[in-house]
Amino acid sequence: MKKRLVSAAVTVALFIGLIAGVTFKASDQKEIKHFTAFFSVEGDNIDPDNDIKKLIASQIGAECEETWLVGQDKDDAINSLIATGEYPDFVLGETALYEADALIPIDEYWDDYPNIKEYLSDEQWEKLRQPDGHIYWIPPFGISHGDDVEMLHNGEAFWIQTRVLKWAGYPKITTIEQYFDLIESYVQANPTMPDETENIPFTMLCDDWRYFCLENVPQFLDGFPNDGSCMVDTETKKVMDYNVTDTAKRYFGKLNEEFHKGIMDPGAFNATYDQYLDKLSTGAVLGMVDQWWQFYYAIDPVFKKQNLAQLGCDYVPLPVTIDDGIHNRWHTNRMAEIDYSSGVSITTSCKDIEGAMKFISDLLESDIIRERFWGEEGKDYSVDENGLFYLTNEQAEKKSDSSYQTAHMCSYSYFPRVEGMLDDGINAFSMEFQQDEFFRNQPVDIQECFDAYGVENYVELLGKNDAPGSWYPMYSYSDSIPTTSECGKVKNNLEAVKKRWLPQVIMADDFGAAWDQYMEEYNACNPHIYFDYLQQKINEN
């Protein structure tokens, strides 16, 4: 903890040195406003003289210096900021910062900025109103005006390497039993990689707040989408606790069985996030349950450098449920998964609120979105005779060059963007969502796998699902519960019990006895207080 606090203090000290209101003269003598931002997630820094950042600044008259979490806990960093009372211009707003009076009410300023006011529907904005009646943050992801396009499954799934599927003849895998049977068979026949590195059959991420892929799997196995905190019966509108279902007991019993067979990675429960990524980066992990964004962007450059696609080490998701006949809902349409519990906020330390609002508004212009996610025409992408964007081989190579990306591309990734199609109605807002370019730029083993299953992208491997109801996703409500409230304390206690007990349950020699002890301690936390609150939120929709 001491190390975390020191690291957080360093971050805060950096912010104090960056506090905004500063301007400078660009080479053409046009005044460029300079803003600062801290996003309480891990992210990639770009070069100070980044090409696209400078290009956008020359067009809109402003730029923003972004900083990210580095080796510290999110809550520690936010609490350290609150303790100083000084903030960068922009932060990833959430309940704790709202309660600390650190944020300005965006809805008091947005009448002059239709790009912001019309970014969401009135109904969607209402979900963001805080107890005082105002709106303090803007969700950056999942907002699409017009047609939506989806290629990636950015969420949670049981992932498996393409080499395992290819070895087995690309079988149909739909249950948790089939998933582990396949991994067991493969590792028995192929205990090592070609370089004699021992294969790791199955692992998972259990570090700190990222442990959700350990605890929330039962909801998916029962065919429910990622409400994140509960399951909701769409007919009765009743909240259900996925932690105590028969499926939960069966699933963790299965992990216990796989642990004792040597299939489940014994080091998973003590590994840090970085150690987990290091393990995946070897190419030796055959399968895991995780959310795409937690692993892909970290391991993809390593896989490319080591040419691991040639060995079939890339991952694809499988539509796994607890039993055959259950419709899987691992993938819900991206537009339905807006997280209302956090988003971009302007802080009370910002000395140019109107300028900050204009900066956000300008970033939502279609031409600027094109530059954020496609780059410069002729340099980063080309245009055919029909106006369709595509990448030449040279441009595709640049996209895979991390040094080039750091020096050249600037997506302002945690600022709001309009997804779906650009204003031209032809091109997707980002290359990752342009079907032809998406497939062409996939590793060779992914292309072979898609062809074998008759699909063109990751989403088609799972299938699409609409939002189950107006309440979805419920984690927008659970993540907004004040930690000091009775409900917040119960939620924290339940999480602590799960973090402590689930690894013990999986490793126990007597699973039944360990499960009973776990359930006894879980129920002692009065979970009904938490789930009654969630039911109340359902009833209000």
What label would you give each PLM region?
Residues 101-129, 183-187, 197-232, 237, ...:
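Carboxylate/His-rich catalytic cores and anion/metal-binding grooves
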Residues 31-35, 60-64, 84-89, 101-104, ...:
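Loop/turn elements at helix/coil->beta-strand transitions in domains of secreted/extracellular proteins
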Residues 284-288, 296-405:
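Structured mid-domain segments that build the active-site/substrate or prosthetic-cofactor binding neighborhood
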Residues 69, 92-93, 269, 289-292:
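Short beta-strand and adjacent tight-turn residues that come in two discontinuous sequence segments
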Residues 40, 370-500, 509:
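Conserved small-residue motifs centered on glycine
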Residues 134, 139-212, 233-288, 344-386, ...:
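Helix-loop-helix "hinge/cap" segment bordering the ligand-binding cleft or interdomain interface
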